[in-house]
């Protein structure tokens, strides 16, 4: 009987976060819940309308925006990527749990992908509830759960010689610096195939 050879793991191929297709925005909706990933600008009104209910006495909206610095370093912009099928399932699971736990009438969670300039929104979360206290608590919990669990990565692009750093969404961990050698296009393509960029630890989205 032939002995099966162990498969060699290519660690370099795991270095980059998985990519999403900009041409295919993705979303999932069910009664009281809406989750989406998109490369478009985020629209407050459309997210609020997703959670409107005649039984709700309060709607709370959280907007995460790109700030112009991180640890005193100037940030030019953020760039987000995601493994969309898994991220959407995680977002849906979070929203289902929070909807039930807090007795909400609606919850919507939309995350932007691609480049997000300074001052623009990278995430919108809206919740509606009969009472404001539950809405406040649910909105905060939804944000923290999203940051801790959803499969979205960001790259911070620093000014000057700072370069770029990949980070995931969890607070407190260190990202991985992206080194981009000044070489020809053909060599760049080859390096990308080898996984030249790193997938960071975990840190803030916004």
UniProtKB/Swiss-Prot annotation:
Q: Where is the composition biased (Basic and acidic residues)?
A: 177-188
Protein name in UniProt: Molybdopterin synthase catalytic subunit
Q: Which InterPro entries match?
A: MoaE_sf, MOCS2B_euk, Mopterin_biosynth_MoaE
Cellular compartment(s): Cytoplasm
Q: What is the disulfide pattern of this chain?
A: none
Q: In which pathway does it act?
A: Cofactor biosynthesis; molybdopterin biosynthesis
Q: Which UniProt keywords apply?
A: Cytoplasm, Molybdenum cofactor biosynthesis, Transferase
Species name for this entry? Neurospora crassa (strain ATCC 24698 / 74-OR23-1A / CBS 708.71 / DSM 1257 / FGSC 987)
UniProt-listed Enzyme Commission number(s):
2.8.1.12
Q: What does this protein do?
A: Catalytic subunit of the molybdopterin synthase complex, a complex that catalyzes the conversion of precursor Z into molybdopterin. Acts by mediating the incorporation of 2 sulfur atoms from thiocarboxylated MOCS2A into precursor Z to generate a dithiolene group.
EC top class, in one word? transferase
Positions with biased composition (Polar residues): 1-23
Q: Which GO terms describe its biological process?
A: Mo-molybdopterin cofactor biosynthetic process
Q: Where are the transmembrane segments?
A: none
Q: Name one GO molecular function term.
A: molybdopterin synthase activity
**Encoding gene per record:** nit-8
**Sequence positions that bind substrate:** 131-132, 147, 154-156
List, alphabetically, the PANTHER family matched: MOLYBDOPTERIN SYNTHASE RELATED
């Amino acid at each position: 009987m032939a002995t099966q050879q162990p498969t060699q793991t290519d660690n370099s191929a795991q270095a980059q976060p998985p990519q999403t297709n900009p041409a295919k925005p993705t979303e999932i909706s069910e009664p009281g819940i809406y989750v989406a990933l998109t490369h478009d600008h985020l629209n407050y009104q459309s997210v609020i309308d997703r959670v409107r209910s005649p039984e709700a006495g309060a709607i709370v909206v959280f907007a995460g925006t790109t700030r112009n610095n991180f640890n005193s370093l100037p940030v030019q912009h953020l760039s987000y990527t995601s493994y969309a099928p898994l991220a959407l399932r995680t977002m849906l699971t979070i929203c289902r749990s929070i909807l039930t736990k807090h007795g909400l009438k609606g919850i919507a969670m939309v995350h932007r992908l691609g480049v997000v300039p300074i001052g623009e929104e990278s995430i919108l979360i809206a919740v509606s509830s009969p009472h404001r206290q539950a809405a406040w608590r649910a909105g905060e919990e939804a944000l923290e759960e999203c940051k801790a669990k959803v499969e979205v990565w960001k790259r911070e692009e620093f000014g000057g010689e700072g370069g770029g750093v990949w980070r995931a969404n969890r607070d407190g961990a260190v990202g991985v610096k992206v080194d981009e050698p000044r070489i020809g296009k053909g060599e760049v393509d080859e390096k990308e195939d080898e996984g030249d960029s790193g997938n960071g630890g975990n840190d803030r989205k916004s």
